[in-house]
Design a protein with these regions (language model features):
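Conserved HGGG/HGGXW glycine-rich cap/lid loop of the alpha/beta-hydrolase fold
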Residues: 10-67
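Active-site loop/oxyanion-hole signature of alpha/beta-hydrolase fold enzymes
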Residues: 57-97
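Short beta-strand/loop motif that positions the catalytic acidic residue
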Residues: 235-236, 242-244
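Conserved hydrolase catalytic core segment
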Residues: 92-135
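Acidic catalytic loop of the alpha/beta-hydrolase fold
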Residues: 247-251
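Flexible "cap/lid" loop of the alpha/beta hydrolase fold
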Residues: 120-159
Length: 301
């Protein structure tokens, strides 16, 4: 994978695909690396938009193939990290497409670097101005508690030796509602399939990055609310599309509805029964979501 050095930050892994005059930056969610887009989203985007757009995927510092993160989490800083990457790659103006945390980073990029954003789309959209943000993000306390039980692994990158331990402790309780040791045999089989499906999207991420991000969600995510409150209403001339599944329990659809009220030019499309991560891994959920984005992008030509 290509890697570029960003002064004062470290190294960032990235990948180009597609062809065309425009550039769409795919911004990852949570602690997933850029392969998060490969299973379902990227094939649809390439098929529908190739010849019109190139796609830039990248790993945040601390994630995937990038170097370890040494600075505290801050969404505006992550937007600046993307700006630095674009500068290093000699890319000027872009279309932003972020999922989950990637939507927050995209929103921050709009605020800080409006002149470089041609359009914005978010899938599963955290709203840091929501009065229901704290109870929504409280789920990360359980995940952080689980990580505290494996502190000896924090300095490591996720690899095949530690992967099952991390996922079984952190994500299995969130998905199945109980500890891995309490799963039935069929549930353990489902957990195994899930681990195999998402390993490539988590490989290389520092476990310390997971710890720091979950702490940020619990204690620091609202610190930048002032910048969002002041900046987002000024984005009236930026084409925007907000996508959200009605079955999304991580970034509930009410957050996208609230953002749509704040951003009257944004179009909100809700997908019945679609979950938070379903579009990234399940073809049935991915197809309507990403085809709708392609329709939006054809309107930007």
């Amino acid at each position: 994978m290509p890697i570029v050095e960003l002064a004062g930050r470290g190294t960032v892994a990235y990948q180009w695909s597609g062809s065309g005059p425009g550039v769409i930056v795919l911004i990852n969610g949570s602690v997933f690396n850029y392969h998060q887009w490969d299973m379902q989203a990227l094939p649809i985007l390439q098929r529908e938009l190739d010849g019109r757009f190139r796609f830039l995927q990248y790993d945040y510092v601390g994630v995937g193939g990038s170097s370890a993160k040494t600075t505290p989490f801050d969404m505006i800083d992550l937007a600046d990290e993307l700006r630095d990457l674009l500068d290093a790659l000699s890319v000027e103006r872009i279309h932003l497409f972020g999922i989950s945390k990637g939507s927050m980073v995209g929103q921050a990029f709009l605020i800080s670097h409006r002149e470089r954003a041609l359009s914005f789309c978010g899938l599963g959209n955290p709203n840091v101005l929501s009065d229901r943000l704290e109870p929504t993000f409280s789920i990360f306390q359980e995940r952080l508690t689980a990580l505290e039980e494996i502190q000896d692994l924090w300095p490591e990158r996720i690899n095949r030796a530690n992967y099952a331990e991390v996922v079984n402790r952190v994500y299995v309780p969130a998905i199945f509602g109980k500890e891995y040791r309490d799963l039935t045999l069929p549930e353990r089989l489902r957990a195994l399939i899930m681990r195999r499906m998402i390993y490539r999207s988590l490989e290389g991420t520092y476990i310390q990055t997971m710890v720091d991000l979950f702490r940020f969600y619990l204690d620091g995510v609202t610190e930048g609310a002032g910048a969002y409150a002041a900046g987002l209403p000024q984005m009236r001339d930026v084409p925007m599309l907000l996508l959200n599944g009605t079955a999304d329990m991580t970034t509930p659809v009410h957050m996208s509805r609230e953002l749509a009220q704040l951003l009257p030019q944004a179009e909100l499309v809700e997908f019945e029964g679609v979950t938070h991560m379903g579009p990234m891994s399940l073809r049935k959920q991915a197809k309507p979501v990403f085809e709708r984005y392609c329709t939006f992008m054809r309107g930007q030509l």
